[in-house]
């Protein structure tokens, strides 16, 4: 097995003997270039609004050995091993979307990796099976061969379109335009609201299953390989909705908004408010996502998410699959955006980047290489947290500021303290 050390003198982070909270930083100028030569005195770090004393500071180099930036000290420093997890979310990605990304990913693995890159491929298949290569490897052929066996979810778009049609039929949207029977209208609206919750809960379970798998993968890698430094995760997905099932709920919302107050009262929706008044109101799904992010940050994972749907699209029904819901342009835009929000959130909160609304996947992989070439690392002593907060999986928010004006800092937003 190859040397798994990611850098000298890194303190213990969230191990059995917890000592230090480590924060990896990407610090860039206005043009997006990494800023070298900074010191610990030029940063401030806060946890839950309280300033923490910086007790550890380092610069880590993951660029290729022959990279020259003009800083003698950095140029002479050895390159650390860079550990990359390629994760393909086969539950939320259709075969068409996966085949759109796969050639570019295959080319990057075959030709674009550096000598100090170690890669592991993990994938969650539509039937719930997980597959992964045995270890982090520099043998690109092993990873490429495994990539060719990854599958997308053939049922996803068909099932959602089928459910949207069923919901439309339950509310009479395909054949009923309103004939003044308020009791019948209320019954249809009530049935639609109930059905939308059933479909939304199914979608939430699906999304949660994918998040649980990712957490299990992180735990497995942590126990098996003991990589001390940051782990880069390139996550390919057809969407990770922040509010699972938003498309179903908005179908009911729009129908309810057109109903009279009396019909809404008969349907049990007497004072109409959208079932989803604003993004982020689905607290259960939000907790799932925030808890997952906190765990990833605890274990030092940085996510770069790739939206495989390329230029737009969503998990809402599609005319190709026999049905497309008659949503307003505003609601359809909210549905499409919702599918991206989980990917945006997981990348931003772990200090990485999200790539979406683009078919230029080759450029995305090149940007990941560039973005992970150098990192600042700062640390502070783990505060004593309330046991109740630990038991409740509280997300402890962290913010890093620079005292030098004009710098852009990207860092993880917080972590979950497991108390171990």
Predicted regions and their residues:
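Scaffold/interface architecture of coatomer-like assemblies
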Residues: 1-420
């Amino acid at each position: 097995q190859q040397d798994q050390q990611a850098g000298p003198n890194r303190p213990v982070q969230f191990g059995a003997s917890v000592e230090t909270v480590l924060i990896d930083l990407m610090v860039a100028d206005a043009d997006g270039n990494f800023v070298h030569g900074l010191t610990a005195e030029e940063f401030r770090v806060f946890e839950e609004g309280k300033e923490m004393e910086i007790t550890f500071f380092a610069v880590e180099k993951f660029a290729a050995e022959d990279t020259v930036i003009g800083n003698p000290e950095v140029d002479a420093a050895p390159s650390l091993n860079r550990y990359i997890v390629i994760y393909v979310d086969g539950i939320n990605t259709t075969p068409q979307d996966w085949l759109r990304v796969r050639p570019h990913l295959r080319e990057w693995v075959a030709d674009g990796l550096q000598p100090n890159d170690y890669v592991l491929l993990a994938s969650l298949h539509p039937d719930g099976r997980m597959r992964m290569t045995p270890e982090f490897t520099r043998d690109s052929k092993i990873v490429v061969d495994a990539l060719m066996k990854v599958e997308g979810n053939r049922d996803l778009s068909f099932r959602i379109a089928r459910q949207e049609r069923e919901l439309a039929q339950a509310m009479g949207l395909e054949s009923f335009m309103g004939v003044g029977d308020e009791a019948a209208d209320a019954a249809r609206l009530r049935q639609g609201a109930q059905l939308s919750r059933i479909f939304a809960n199914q979608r939430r379970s699906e999304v949660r299953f994918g998040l649980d798998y990712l957490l299990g993968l992180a735990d497995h890698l942590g126990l098996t390989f003991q990589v001390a430094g940051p782990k880069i995760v390139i996550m390919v997905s057809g969407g990770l909705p922040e509010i699972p099932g938003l498309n179903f709920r908005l179908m009911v919302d729009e129908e309810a908004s057109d109903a009279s107050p009396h019909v809404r009262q008969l349907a049990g929706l007497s004072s109409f408010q959208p079932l989803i008044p604003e993004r982020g109101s689905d607290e259960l799904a939000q907790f799932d996502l925030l808890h997952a992010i906190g765990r990833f940050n605890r274990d030092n994972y940085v996510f770069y998410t790739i939206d495989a749907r390329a230029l737009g699209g969503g998990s809402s029904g599609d005319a190709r699959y026999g049905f497309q819901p008659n949503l307003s342009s505003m609601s359809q835009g909210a549905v499409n955006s919702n599918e991206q929000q989980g990917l945006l959130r997981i990348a931003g909160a772990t200090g990485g980047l999200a790539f979406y609304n683009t078919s230029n996947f080759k450029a995305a992989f090149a940007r990941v290489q560039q973005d992970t070439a150098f990192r600042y690392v700062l640390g502070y002593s783990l505060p004593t947290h309330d046991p109740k907060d630990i038991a409740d999986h509280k997300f402890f928010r962290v913010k890093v500021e620079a005292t030098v004006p004009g710098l852009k800092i990207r860092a993880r937003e917080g972590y979950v303290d497991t108390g171990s």
